[in-house]
Regions:
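Bacterial extracytoplasmic/cell-wall-associated proteins, especially those involved in peptidoglycan
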Residues: 27-227
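Intrinsic structural disorder
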Residues: 1, 14-15, 60, 80
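Sec/Tat signal peptide C-region and signal peptidase I cleavage site
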Residues: 20-26
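Bacterial N-terminal signal peptides that target proteins for export
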Residues: 1-9
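Bacterial N-terminal signal peptides
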Residues: 10-19
Length: 227
């Protein structure tokens, strides 16, 4: 999964889903980190670049990556293809999105997101430090800008998912062929978009021609017929 981005320096309709939250300031706020929607929002934020960070292209590109990451998590629970077991795809057997994020038995699915010795879902200190920094920037001006929009978009996605399920279309749902390889459609993994990173096994890289690179991440689908 994506390493921690180093900071260099949505106000969409989804805002309607934002309920009881921990407010940082006037423009951007996140739900509590011990709430499912707050924890999920922090993952979406952590996995994409913000302005001034490596891999950042645009607000829309990073937001698209957030949505596809959410689709990966959803697919690992609800869209396991024929011929695969959930444990092969997600590393866990669970209907709980928190389990899919944190992994089980010491195996972490998303770097910096895990359960502590008491079983509480927590983040690594560096994750919270970056999020605090992003919130500070978002709420530090005289009016909301890109940082606030991106933070609120992530929280809106998370709240919408927890309350009503997937809030947007999966751009990879109809993908059937990658080169000579027949694939399942949907993405089931994402990693930092570097050639050296690949989840291996039956995962197939989604190419640029199918928008496989979003928000500094490369997305992967699965072979239709497992090896």
């Amino acid at each position: 999964m994506n390493p921690h981005f180093r900071l260099l320096c949505l106000s969409l309709g989804l805002g309607a889903f934002i309920g009881t939250s921990v407010a940082w300031g006037a423009f951007a706020q996140l739900d509590r980190p011990d709430a499912t929607a707050g924890y999920l929002a922090r993952l979406l934020i952590n996995e994409v670049p913000f302005p001034g960070e490596r891999g950042y292209e645009s607000e829309a590109n990073s937001q698209a990556a957030m949505l596809e990451i959410l689709w990966v998590l959803h697919a690992r629970i609800h869209l396991i293809p024929n011929g695969y077991r959930q444990t092969q795809v997600a590393g866990v057997q669970s209907k709980d999105i928190i389990d899919v994020i944190t992994g089980a038995g010491g195996r972490r699915q998303c770097e910096g997101f895990f359960r502590d010795a008491s079983g509480r879902f927590v983040t690594a200190p560096r994750v919270q430090e970056r999020i605090d920094n992003l919130l500070s920037i978002a709420n530090g001006g005289s009016k909301p800008g890109r940082f606030a929009a991106m933070l609120n978009y992530a929280q809106g996605l998370a709240q919408a998912y927890v309350k009503e399920g997937m809030p947007g279309a999966d751009r990879y749902a109809g993908l059937k062929q990658v080169g000579p390889v027949t694939v399942t459609g949907h993405a089931y993994s994402w990693m930092t978009d570097l050639d050296a990173f690949h989840p291996g096994g039956n995962f197939v890289t989604i190419p640029d021609t199918d928008d496989g690179s979003l928000g500094g991440n490369r997305f992967f689908t699965l072979r239709k017929v497992p090896k």
